[in-house]
Amino acid sequence: PACLEREPLTRAVVTGYAAKVTAEDRAVQRDAFIAAMVWGYGRVGYGPSRVERIMAQPGFEEQLADVTRITLEQGGPAAFEHIRQQRKSGVGCLKHLGAAFGTKYLSFLTKAHRESDIAPVLDSVVRAWFAKHAKDVDVRIGGGWTYPDRYRTYV
């Protein structure tokens, strides 16, 4: 979104983009997705090329719309499971989007639209915190979207 060039991209700003999301408006979904990715990658030089690669995949907008609808209606873990099932069946879903960055989008959506069951980000920073402070909880997710039940333990 063009306005990302004018304001610091804080969690509150990205949550504001997510708050505008509906299950129908793909342009707003795309803006919220981009905001979450820019927030996640920060100032690293390879962020834009990775996001462009994801968004250039055939079916990206339809897949993002499905994930968005499921997140809004059923929550982050259901969307996580949907991505896993689509990939496992060979259909594919948001190719090149890993769980660490995909859960950023899910997290902002649930934070903006749900009063409880906020889906957290599932990245190395969060996993390290759990490893240090909640040693009895197994939050390892393997190489991607492979353990939706473990993601549910976060929620």
Q: What does each model-found stretch correspond to?
A:
Residues 101-104, 125:
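Non-catalytic alpha-helical scaffold/packing segments enriched in small hydrophobic residues
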